[in-house]
Amino acid sequence: MLKNKTRAEKYQTYYTTNEYQIVKEKLPDIIRDAEIKASEVLEPTIYEKRAIMEVIKDFIRDHQRKVYGGTALNEALKQVNPKDAIYDNYSFSDIEFYSPTPVQDLVDLCNILYRKGYKFVQGKDAQHEETYSIFVNFQLYCDITYSPTRVFYGIKTIEIDGINYTDPHFMLIDYLRMVNQPLTAAGQRWEKAFERMYRLLKDYPIEDFDKRLDIPEPPEEIQSYISRIKTEFLSDNKLNESFLISGIEAYNFYIRHAASSKDEEQMARTNRNVVNLNNFIANVPFSELISVNYREDVKNTYNFLRMIVEDKEKISVDEYFPLFQFTGYSTVIKYDDHPIIRIYEGDGYCIPNVKTVKTVENDNGTKTKYEYKYVSFQYVLMILYINKFRAHLDKNKPMYFNYGIAISNLVKARNIYLDQTGKSVLDNTVFKEFRTNCTGNTISFTRMNRLRLLEKRKQGKQTSFVYTPEDFFKKDLETQAKLDPSKARFKNTSGNKIMVPKYLLFKIDNNGNIEDNIHSEEAEISEKEETSGGSSISTDKSFEESPNSSPNSSPNNSLNNSIDISTNNYDDRSENSLDSLTSD
């Protein structure tokens, strides 16, 4: 009988440590070679993509649209340092541009591509609200984003090869918006945003001004009210949960913090020998607060001010539409026509901030503790850029330049502080970037998009738009004639003062009391109203090209009639509804 023998198990190495390092080093180049080969043979090939992209670029040139996003950054970087470009000849990226008439542009551009013989041409809603995508042969080629006429003509650009690309520092606002949304953007966007922001600021650095802000001091009475908002009104712990200090007051907070550090007069990053940071402190023209409980906080603030002002009859309230994608609604409360406070709607966002505690000794020897929340350094930097843009739209030259100086001073103070303390931008100081602690409730973009579609469906509104030229041109001429892209409606995000009562969020009764306007309607504007409103561009080159403010329009009721103009859905991201825009 044979004896059972147990064989000793032996193992062998497949990759040595040295081989692992070699593969890690060389694999990216091998992958890149494979991607280039794939782009040349897989449909749609890189050659087809390039040809289609040239058609789109010609459209952008002819219609003077404004390109933003990755393509705009790539072209701007190439002008300064081609090595900093984020794309190469074999990298393909869709192109994004702003338009005051995005639906009309979508239809026209789809028709051009279809008539040139390209297959599977389709335009449809993108995932971002008021943005539309064009696909050709199942490939995404461009996103067209609605921009109010007033905003569109106010966007500064650089022209390259006949195409207007958004100014790099206008692009910076978008990157700052990403880093100021820690709960919804960190996982997917922060790494890319930081890399792009680094290259942008390296090639297009922030201008260094040697000036103080020239903001007039408000009347003493207004200063008193501004101070009491902070020391009395915001001392309420409940309000502290929903209010964040922003604007020039937040700017002063960071300047003072940098000035309190030792040896603040020595500056390594700014290449200057002497500076007194206390000179950067600016007059606060009015308080600026961001509220994550907007409606209640506006009413509470108004009621507080009515209690402390000398003459209640002199209080007034102005409301403003959201400014593009940058801010929500805002309310300015004035006394004797002098602004005391501007409150911005921050609902739906979790806003990064710095919490502070200040103890003050009272006359009777007792001590009072004040706790405040200031928006984070990166957030106030973003707000200064947005306010600078708003001042440009409003043709407010003094404040336009003041905000430019404030941006310069804020960055300078931060650099001084970090150099002299030996801290980094990620160390736990008030200048810490990429903060994850935030105030406010938010939801993911995908969830918000789905909830928005559900709400539209409940209201009987059109939930999606798909345009396929191949299907459209098969219809009879009478049906074709009903298509009217100019009936597309968009939210009023002009940033203008709200003049029509039915669009106001608040109502002041005959006794001066404030309440919600329960009959408030959401203001919309059509493409036809955008184009008929007109705009003119200032020739004052000492400032910037700037449009005249377009008047607020009173839109008609939303379009109810619709027809199908597509029987094919070339992308599964959209809803099943294929409603269109038609003439009555």
Curated annotation (Swiss-Prot):
Superkingdom of origin organism: Viruses
Comp. bias regions, Low complexity: 546-569
Keywords: ATP-binding, mRNA processing, Nucleotide-binding, Transcription, Transferase, Virion
Reactions accelerated catalytically: RNA(n) + ATP = RNA(n)-3'-adenine ribonucleotide + diphosphate
UniProt-listed InterPro entries: APMV_polyA_pol_cat_2nd, PolyA_pol_cat_su
Biased composition (Basic and acidic residues): 522-531
Pfam families for this protein: APMV_polyA_pol_cat_2nd, Poly_A_pol_cat
Positions of disulphide bridges: none
The protein's Enzyme Commission number: 2.7.7.19
Region (Disordered): 522-584
GO molecular function: ATP binding; poly(A) RNA polymerase activity
Localization per record: Virion
Gene Ontology biological process terms in this record: mRNA processing
GO CC terms in record: virion component
Family assignment from sequence similarity: Belongs to the poxviridae poly(A) polymerase catalytic subunit family. Highly divergent.
Primary role: Polymerase that creates the 3'-poly(A) tail of mRNA's.
Name the record gives this protein: Putative poly(A) polymerase catalytic subunit
Origin species: Acanthamoeba polyphaga mimivirus
